[in-house]
């Protein structure tokens, strides 16, 4: 099954790791853009990006998923399922309808 994973914080890392360890085909990982953090405002990648890169997965960091560019990327990945875990953005209808088996969302709140 071709899975696109969408997540950002530490909370989402275990889900990504579990999908990977389960042998699922993760065709792309979407996460929020790197952002300045701390007193020195050092540009810092989200935890999901760090994990995905360690696993050798392709990472996408669009500022918005509501652009034609982001939609085109998702279409090209041809996902069967999109797994969303604390991504931090509301997905538009076009994305929700894209995968063959739909989207699954988990959030800590």
Task: Identify what each model region corresponds to.
Residues 1-109:
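One-carbon transfer enzymes
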């Amino acid at each position: 099954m071709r899975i696109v994973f969408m997540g950002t914080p530490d909370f989402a890392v275990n889900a990504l790791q579990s999908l990977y360890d389960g042998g699922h085909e993760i065709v792309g990982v979407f996460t929020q853009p790197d952002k300045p953090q701390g007193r020195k405002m050092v540009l810092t990648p989200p935890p999901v990006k760090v994990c995905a890169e360690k696993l050798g997965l392709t990472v996408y960091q669009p500022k918005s998923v509501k652009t034609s560019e982001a939609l085109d990327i998702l279409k090209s990945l041809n996902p069967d399922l999109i797994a969303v875990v604390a991504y931090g953005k509301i997905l538009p209808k076009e994305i929700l309808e894209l995968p063959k088996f739909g989207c699954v969302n988990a959030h800590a709140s």
